[in-house]
Amino acid sequence: NADVACCVADILLQAENVIGNVQAEVVITGSAGLGLSERLGLPFVQEVIAVSNFVKSSKMEINTLIDIGGEDAKIIFFDKGQMPLMRMNGNCAGGTGAFIDQMAVVLGVAVEELDALAQRAEHIYAIASRCGVFAKTDVQILVAKAVSKQDIAASIFNAIALQVISSLSKGLPIKPKILLCGGPLTYIKSLRQAFERQLHLSETDLLCLEYSNLIPAMGCIYSQTQQSFVTSLSEFAQRLKSANLSTTCQSQSGPQPIFSSRGELL
C-alpha cells in the first residue's frame, strides 16, 4: 500500500458502495499526505495539530498522548491553559512500526504473528531498540541461544516501549490518562501491555479507542483551514488516480543523467 493516492482512491470507491456518492469536504493530514496535498492543491493540517484538536474537542481528560506510526513516534503532553508540548522521533526507525516490521523479518514470522507469540512469553530480554541494526544483532544472538520466539517477540515490544518513553519524555512526567494513537498501539495488545509495565500503570490508565489509528483523520474535522475543498467521493477518487498516473509518468521519464556516456563517467 505504498501507492498512497491509489490506495485512498480505492477506499473512497468502497465507501461509495456503502454510503453512496455523497459530497464531502476534503482535508489531508499525515506525513504521507503532505506531497499529495501539494500536488492536488488540497487543504493540509499538520498531524500534531489534528491530534491536539481531537483531544481538545473530545472532552476526554487526557494528559498524555503516545503515538507510534510507521515511520515516527511522538508523545504529546497536554496541560490545561498551556499549548500542547510535543516530542517526536522521526530520524530513526527505532521505536516505530518500521522497527516492528524489521524484527518480524529477522524472526521469520509475519507481523501479525508477533502479538500472539508475545502473549505466551515467559521472560523478557534486553534488546537495543534505538537502532534497528543493533537490535537485529541482539535478536540474532537470542535466536542463536535458542531463546523462544515467544520471549523474543515480547522483548521486542518491551524494547519499543523503553525507547519511546526514555527518548521522548526527556524528563517530563507521562501522566495518565494516556491516549494511545497509531496502528501498532491500536492492533498490538502486547505493545500496549509493554507500556503498562514500563510506566507502572493499569490498563484503565491507557485509553485505546476502537479507531485510535484514525485519530489524526478525525482531528481534521475540528481543524480550521484557510481554504475549503468539497467534492463527491467518485470525483475525488478519479482525481487521485489521475494525479497518481501523471506523477508515475513523470517519474518514469525522470531527470537527465549526470553522465551521458560511460566515457564521461570514466
Where are these regions (language model features)?
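Short beta-strand-loop/turn "lid" adjacent to the catalytic site in phosphate-handling enzymes
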Residues: 1, 16-49, 58, 77, ...
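Glycine-rich phosphate-binding loop of actin/hexokinase-like ATP-binding domains
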Residues: 46-107
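Acidic, glycine/GT-rich loop-and beta-edge segments that sit at the periphery of enzyme/chaperone cores
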Residues: 74, 223-266
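Glycine-rich phosphate-binding loops at beta-strand->alpha-helix junctions
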Residues: 32, 169-198, 209-213
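Glycine-rich phosphate-binding loop plus the immediately following alpha-helix
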Residues: 82-123, 213, 219-228
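Adenine-nucleotide phosphate-binding core of ATP-dependent small-molecule kinases
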Residues: 135-170
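Short glycine-rich, Thr/Ser-proximal phosphate-binding strand/loop in the N-terminal lobe
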Residues: 1-8, 13, 84-92
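Conserved phosphate-binding/catalytic loops in two-lobed NTP-binding clefts
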Residues: 44-48, 195-218
